[in-house]
From Swiss-Prot:
Recorded name of the encoding gene: tilS
Full protein name: tRNA(Ile)-lysidine synthase
Amino acids binding ATP: 24-29
Main location: cytoplasm
Catalysed reactions, semicolon-separated: cytidine(34) in tRNA(Ile2) + L-lysine + ATP = lysidine(34) in tRNA(Ile2) + AMP + diphosphate + H(+)
Function of the protein: Ligates lysine onto the cytidine present at position 34 of the AUA codon-specific tRNA(Ile) that contains the anticodon CAU, in an ATP-dependent manner. Cytidine is converted to lysidine, thus changing the amino acid specificity of the tRNA from methionine to isoleucine.
Gene Ontology CC annotations of this record: cytoplasm
Tagged with keyword Cytoplasm: yes
Length: 430
């Protein structure tokens, strides 16, 4: 079956009819763009297609500007709208990982509802991905490599060229007289993928002609085995995970280590996080799940933090330490730090009404300076028939997790705490 006919059949089964093509300007994505342009013209068996393309300008090569221009010229030729997005690459975890993260986050910004991202990954890419997973010591999920349709970073992705080799794409490009750019970094064998592509895999393909197809079969077996595990554990998983970012630990400690790690991986996958290593999972189980009951353990996973409270795990973003932050309330609206939103105040004849998120509190007017602070460790009186008590006890009774307590705006009149907005008011001691 040729490329065009195969993709046409794939699109007949696809739920989306709007597609955003990831266009680098290289051979693979140029072929992909050409095929979709032809389908737009052909379409006897397809409903009308909405096609756009996006080029990510990483700024890592001196040729990056000329690549962007090439992509624009190509899209003008095919009459396909193009988005060119410049990104800053965070190299903390390596250029490859940083570029990939920046690329997908930029694409996510432009992907519309009901639109599907289309990438030009092919059979050779699949083999490379499998070997990279093997090098990392990945389990079934990692060795399952790429699927023709999947979800990544919360985006639906279609990879229609996954069943074709690079040689087949080259033959198509030459037949159609297509022009494409070549990224000079593809020859740099310091990068693992390039080392595999340029040094290792050619030797294997020379010895075994159908090596890529064999790898694809193995990857598919791994994917199916992982799906089977997920199916068998789905009922138990639902008992532990009824809220997406929360994982209940009831009965969890009684399971085998294999069952524990499988359920945790399902939870992390549900939240679209990259899979941790076996060492990291073991550390999470030992240092967080099996930590002492009174502890407030946490575990950092790239840009997320796993925390434990009242026998549940919670997934949050990393939070800034706001305990030394004091903000003077001098206007009706105050912008709070660390993405906490705005605190606003309205007044009537006798009172001030403070609003934050979905909460509000009404306090008497004052001539004292008003400030907003975060975190307090003293004693307060909240309940009329009880004496002053440690604020920690009040937070515990209200069921507020420790990491949230220092993120709730505290209203001070002078140096006197008056209220934790939305949670409690401080009463005068009798």
């Amino acid at each position: 079956m040729d490329l065009l006919s195969d993709i046409e059949k794939q699109l007949q089964k696809a739920t989306a009819q709007a597609f955003l093509i990831a266009l680098s300007g290289g051979l693979d994505s140029t072929v992909l763009l050409s095929l979709f342009a032809k389908l737009c013209q052909k379409q006897p068996h397809l409903p009308p297609l909405s096609i756009r393309a996006i080029h990510i300008h990483h700024g890592l090569s001196p040729n990056a500007d000329s690549w962007a221009k090439h992509c624009q010229d190509l899209c003008d030729q095919f009459q396909i709208p193009l988005i060119i997005e410049r990104v800053q690459v965070d190299k903390t975890n390596g250029i490859e990982a940083g570029a990939r993260e920046a690329r997908y986050q930029a694409i996510k910004k432009y992907l519309q509802t009901q639109e599907m991202l289309v990438t030009a990954h092919h059979l050779n890419d699949q083999t490379e991905t499998f070997f990279l997973a093997l090098k990392r010591g990945s389990g079934l999920k990692g060795l399952g490599a790429m699927q023709q349709q999947s979800v990544l970073f919360g985006m639906p992705i279609l990879r229609p060229l996954l069943g074709f080799t690079r040689t087949q794409l080259e033959n198509y490009a030459q037949k159609e007289k297509l022009n494409w750019i070549t990224d000079e970094s593809n020859e740099d064998n310091r990068y693992d993928r390039n080392f595999l592509r340029n040094e290792i895999l050619p030797e294997l393909r020379e010895r075994w002609a159908h090596f890529d197809l064999a790898v694809q079969r193995s990857a598919q077996h791994c994917f199916e085995q992982q799906q089977l595990i997920n199916d068998l554990l789905s009922e138990i998983f639902t008992e532990h995970c009824q809220i997406k970012n929360q994982f209940k630990l009831c009965q969890f400690r009684q399971y085998s280590l294999a069952k524990q790690t499988a359920l945790l991986r399902m939870w992390l996958a549900e939240n679209q996080l990259e899979m941790p290593s076996k060492r990291q999972l073991t550390q999470l189980i030992n240092d967080v799940i099996f930590a002492k009951e009174e502890a407030n353990p946490q575990f950092q996973l790239v840009n997320k933090v796993i925390r434990r409270y009242q026998d549940s795990l919670y997934l949050t973003k990393p939070f800034s330490d706001l305990t030394k932050c004091t903000l003077k309330l001098e206007q009706n609206t105050l912008n709070l730090p660390d993405d906490l939103g705005n605190l606003t105040v309205q007044e009537n004849e006798h009172n001030l009404i403070f609003y934050w998120q979905d909460y509000s509190v009404t306090l008497e007017k004052t001539n004292l300076p008003i400030s907003i602070r975060f975190g307090y460790s003293g004693k307060v009186k909240h309940y009329p028939k009880r004496p002053r008590e440690d604020i920690k006890k009040i937070w515990q009774e209200l069921g507020v997790p420790p990491w949230e307590r220092n993120r709730i705006p505290l209203i001070f009149y002078g140096n006197e705490l008056k209220s934790a907005v939305g949670f409690f008011r401080v009463l005068k001691s009798s």
